[in-house]
């Protein structure tokens, strides 16, 4: 599962110490990327230079309401800083107003300055109607981006229903990133079973450390070696001792 995870830290109060820990964990668990705010791209690149983990950053985040020129500048700046992947928020209001050409043009302008690097387009599904989600997916198809991404994490996150709807209308080459509210291994598995190829989460380590507590009477999950809430203890790795 690790190769599907974008380990994410986009909080306003993230510190150098926080980003360093994020990158150390990413190297240990071999995540696909770390996703950080633009300010921390150079630091993340330095910390991950001897690893396979890529550095992702955000554009127009989290509202998507910056002008096209600002988003393009953000993209150029992030490319120069060394970012490998880019998660861009569309202009949600413009989409809802039916300004389809504006939304398409903005995506294309950003894509054109990325030197062929991975572009994920965040459509913020929780703020859209079913018809608007369909239109957003069609725009992603037509602009040949790499991923459509469900959420910023600042509103309601991904849902199974949203992913099924996206799958119905996306092209064969458009990949799907689910994000927002994915906190457990079970959460992640639900989306991966639907064909999602990237999971955005700030709980990446917890997700990989989750295990099925086979010997626990309640059949629930707990962290290996720790006591479950039912009072029993996880024995999952006893056979490895």
Go through the PLM ranges and name each one:
Residues 45, 66-77, 128-139, 161-172, ...:
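Catalytic cores of alpha/beta
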Residues 38, 42-63, 98-125, 142-143, ...:
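Alpha-helix-loop-beta-strand connector modules within alpha/beta enzyme cores
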Residues 211-241:
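Histidine-centered metal-binding segments
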Residues 23, 27-43, 61-66, 86-104, ...:
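Glycine-rich, proline-tolerant flexible connector loops at the mouths of alpha/beta enzymes
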């Amino acid at each position: 599962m690790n190769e599907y995870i974008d380990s994410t830290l986009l909080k306003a109060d993230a510190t150098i110490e926080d980003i360093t820990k994020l990158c150390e964990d990413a190297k240990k668990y071999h995540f696909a990327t770390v996703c950080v705010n633009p300010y921390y791209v150079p630091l993340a690149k330095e910390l991950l230079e001897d690893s396979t983990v890529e550095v992702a950053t955000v554009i127009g985040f989290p509202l998507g309401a910056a002008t096209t020129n600002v988003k393009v500048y953000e993209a150029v700046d992030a490319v120069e800083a060394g970012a490998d992947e880019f998660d861009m928020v569309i202009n949600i209001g413009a989409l809802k107003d039916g300004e389809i050409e504006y939304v398409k043009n903005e995506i294309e302008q950003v894509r054109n300055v990325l030197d062929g690097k991975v572009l994920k387009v965040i459509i913020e599904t929780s703020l859209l109607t079913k018809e608007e989600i369909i239109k957003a997916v069609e725009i992603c198809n037509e602009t040949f981006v790499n991923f459509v991404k469900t959420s910023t994490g600042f509103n309601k996150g991904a849902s199974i229903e949203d992913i099924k709807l996206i799958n119905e209308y996306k092209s064969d080459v458009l990949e799907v990133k689910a994000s927002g509210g994915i906190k457990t291994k079970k959460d992640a598995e639900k989306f991966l079973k639907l064909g999602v190829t990237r999971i955005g989460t700030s709980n990446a380590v917890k997700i990989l450390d989750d295990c099925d507590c086979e010997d626990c009477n309640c059949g629930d999950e707990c962290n290996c070696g720790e006591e479950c809430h039912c009072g029993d203890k996880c024995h999952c790795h006893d056979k490895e001792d």
